[in-house]
Amino acid sequence: MAKQKTLSKTKSTTPTNQVDGVIESIGPQGQLITSIENGILVDAGQDESVSVMFGAHMTVGVYPEDHGQPDATLVASMGQSGFLEIEIVGVSISEMLGIKAGGPVSVTW
């Protein structure tokens, strides 16, 4: 289960929340299924103030499962699994980037 950390706010542009987790498994379409529960992320937005870091990679925003993003877009979403999922729409992110279960994931907003 993911741990939530609250960071002190020093500027209005500084993130105030961080949740750390791991990639728990790889889904049937090659998406990364994390240990971060969707419920923890309800206050995180879909804009550039939210960053999702996983290994050496990053995307912005946490979108609903039915995000409607076009093919080849890197997206973090509240997955059907009940946990944060990271995908490249229409492509196996696990195969394309060589990412395996066990790697770190961090969401800040």
Language-model region placement:
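Charge-biased, low-complexity intrinsically disordered regions
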Residues: 1-109
